[in-house]
Amino acid sequence: MDQQPERREGRSFPERKGQKRKLEEGAAAVEDREISAVSTDGGQALLSEVAAQVSVLNSAFSWQESDRAAAKRATQVLAELAKNEDLVNVIVDGGAVPALMTHLQAPPYNDGDLAEKPYEHEVEKGSAFALGLLAIKPEYQKLIVDKGALPHLVNLLKRNKDGSSSRAVNSVIRRAADAITNLAHENSSIKTRVRVEGGIPPLVELLEFSDSKVQRAAAGALRTLAFKNDDNKNQIVECNALPTLILMLGSEDAAIHYEAVGVIGNLVHSSPHIKKEVLTAGALQPVIGLLSSCCPESQREAALLLGQFASTDSDCKVHIVQRGAVRPLIEMLQSPDVQLKEMSAFALGRLAQDAHNQAGIAHSGGLGPLLKLLDSRNGSLQHNAAFALYGLADNEDNVSDFIRVGGIQKLQDGEFIVQATKDCVSKTLKRLEEKIHGRVLRHLLYLMRISEKSIQRRVALALAHLCSPEDQRTIFIDDNGLELLLGLLGSLNTKQQLDGAAALYKLANKSMALSPVDAAPPSPTQRVYLGEQYVNNATLSDVTFLVEGRTFYAHRICLLASSDAFRAMFDGGYREKDARDIEIPNIKWEVFELMMRFIYTGSVDITNEISKDLLRAADQYLLEGLKRLCEYTIAQDITLESIGDMYELSEAFHAMSLRQACIMFILEHFDKLSSMPWQNELVQRTIPEIREYFCRALTKSTTNLQSLRL
């Protein structure tokens, strides 16, 4: 059920991200406007501009100041055009890649050249920048690398080695690192080639560079190179990058600690041995500190990394909590940033695999925000919240808190996007159900007695769904839980009515599992059945009934054995006692014939059309077996439109099984009945009978359970 969020590679497109780039004053500003005009003009003007700049690069590879100035401007123009992704194809097709490649290195130095090198490092910087922008497509990444860019870019990373230190040196190193980042982005083969070309050691060294932008660029490149590449990860660690990266976690520069935590996260991902080294190197507390960073990206990466630290093969779950991670993680659950909430829920879900952490997270206020996230329409966020709640449900100390904050209703009523989340929620409810006994149940009963009304109702609702059948009588009869549910059912609040009805329906089904009553009743045991051949047969008949002017031949011995009504008729002081012919008024012939057929055979086929008249006759003549068969037949035909009439019928003829079926129908279909204008009146009318039914059913089910155990 645990699903780790995907890590993402970084990519360095600073200008595409809206960061401002400083342009040289004067003519450079004018040139920039000219470039913008070309890029928006398109067509032939663009092709001509690209061709012109490529021609300059191909012809200006020397230390002459005019060549250096022209080459610098050409790289700037191409880079400016490449910021528009729609123009990249035109630039590459125009031959820009090999031309820019040439200028990744300084031109050869001749004896006649000046001692001072004009625009030193700046042309190389511009070339690296432009090539990085062109690496927007995988095929262009490969083209640039196949042309031999990597060795030159790696050499640019070492420009500070000759002792020179200037803004230009810093810039060329940074652009080289950014270009490597973009070339290797989501390209495993190029990541490997960077390592083979020796790119990782200088990048690790640059983590300690004095210029913060260079540090950030180096960390960004290492982050990309470490992503899903085990050999690169191992070399980064072997180059002793961890101590510096951990120091960078504490930087006040958000951009630096964001890249640093990203590198560490990619190193740790799917690499248990590196995770162990990272923890040994002291990363835990700085990462926890980033949870309170002003940078949401750093917070997100830190939460994800803590979730990785707390995976099932780790023993540091408790340490993470002890060092103060829980409260900031819970605060992050309430952020407007969806990804921040997702990573926080992920981390808490991992931490909640420890029993003491489960109690601590709930005690610190984690339950409410996690339950709220179940309303999210983001499937990944919803699932991570559900998984965290699944962990918290494993601790008995949290069960009452789940119920007190309305967690059971939240889990039951939620609309979950993916099947994995639905399964997780089902398992959470099952886990909670298994814990409602012993001290947990005693605590809940205590809350149901002394808490404010809203809490009492939540407890009663939860117990109706989750309690064991053997505890139903204690909870709902002895401790008044039934009255709380009936109070909800009789409420004027529709939501409360629906919750009460659903809980009562669940409770009824549980009790019926031990005392099933919805199956078709068997024929009653009777001492005398003469058989089908004696139905309306004059043979040995000693009494006849006159029904609608027709004669029905019967036998006293069979009638006496069938019901108290006939025994009173023939053995009591009524005039029918000695009569040979008895008139039966107010009953149809077909109804009387079916009633007598039941008396003679113990069974009869009952149709919907005749069932109500037959029920009336069965009630009049006290034929309980026939009455139950009629009630069962009628109950199969209950609808939203007929439920009111059916309930009246059950009252008129003391039809207890039919009345129970009506009650169950009302509870099961309460949401649909709520739109009926007469619904509220019907509910209020049935509440006394519902109370009586549950008192009878819960007492009976408990007795049955006890007898089963004996």
Swiss-Prot record:
Q: Would the keyword Nucleus turn up in this protein's UniProt record?
A: yes
> Which residues belong to any copy of the BTB domain?
541-608
Q: Where are the transmembrane segments?
A: none
**Pfam families named in the record:** Arm, BTB
According to its UniProt record, in which tissues is this protein expressed? Detected in embryos and most of the vegetative and reproductive organs.
Any one cellular component term from GO for this entry? plasma membrane
Please give the name of this protein.
ARM REPEAT PROTEIN INTERACTING WITH ABF2
In its UniProt entry, the species of origin is given as: Arabidopsis thaliana (Mouse-ear cress)
Q: Which UniProt keywords apply?
A: Nucleus, Repeat, Ubl conjugation pathway
Q: Where is this region: Disordered?
A: 1-35
What results from gene inactivation? Abscisic acid (ABA) and glucose insensitivities. More efficient germination and postgermination growth.
Summarize subunit and interaction data from the UniProt record for this chain.
Interacts with ABF2. Interacts with DUF7/AIP1.
ARM repeats mapped onto the chain: 85-127, 138-185, 188-227, 230-269, 272-311, 314-353, 355-394, 429-468, 470-509
What is the induction note for this entry?
Answer: Up-regulated by abscisic acid (ABA) and high salt.
Q: Which InterPro entries does the protein's record reference?
A: ABAP1/ARIA, ARM-like, ARM-type_fold, Armadillo, BTB/POZ_dom, SKP1/BTB/POZ_sf
Localization of this protein: Nucleus
The function of this protein is: May act as a substrate-specific adapter of an E3 ubiquitin-protein ligase complex (CUL3-RBX1-BTB) which mediates the ubiquitination and subsequent proteasomal degradation of target proteins. Acts as a positive regulator of ABA response via the modulation of the transcriptional activity of ABF2, a transcription factor which controls ABA-dependent gene expression via the G-box-type ABA-responsive elements. Negative regulator of seed germination and young seedling growth.
